[in-house]
Amino acid sequence: MTYSLAGQTITAPDTGGHGLDMSHGQDWLVEDCLIDLSACPLDQLDEAVGVVWGSSAVFRRCVIRGAGKLVLCGSGDTDKLNVERGKTVIFEDCILEDFGRRGPEAQSGMRIMLRGCLIRNWGAPDRFDVRSFASWAHHGGSIEAVDCVFDQPRAWRGWHIMVRDWLAHLGQAWNDEGLRGLLRPANWLPGVCRGLVATAGGQVRAENCHATRWWIRLEGHRGPHMSRSQAQALMARLENMR
């Protein structure tokens, strides 16, 4: 059975702290929805969207914004690995913006496909908790981005955030891979630079994508990049969805 949601606006979390909680093997189709948790205190939130425990989802023409942790695909629970492995979450013509991290994050063997999406302003100062990144795959998760734009308004977020973020990423690298993780140059990147990255057994792939800043890292990119004019046209088209 597929659960459908269309034309809805979500501005507050459920009792579990999620804007939209997809779990227990549910399949979802979400179209033309706004999930905006920017008015909610971070301590009242978990993810804006969580797709876990054997669920899958397709998002079309949605705007998801304003959470510390935006989109998590895969719970990381070892007892759920068998039901999560191979499940797919697709984002088509979506905007993911103004968040701290997980825009999106894939783990536990889950697969994310980004098609014609805008990922913008991760590590937003008012949504930052412990570290920041946009799209991250690890522990068997994978992310494929095609025709997407990764946009950051600025690199510097203040000493307090930058130092906390950098130390938290090094701590995560140590927790995931030990000394080997600390020896990987990519693990020393500040979060604001992490547009599309994979560590600790994750995989990422990109085609015809564009980073608006030279310092935004897009790993696994194959073939020519989207031009600046094409990126501006895509962003304008997506903005017209609002």
Could you tell me what each predicted segment is?
Residues 238-240:
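Short, low-complexity, Pro/Ser/Thr/Gly-rich segments in the mature regions of secreted, periplasmic
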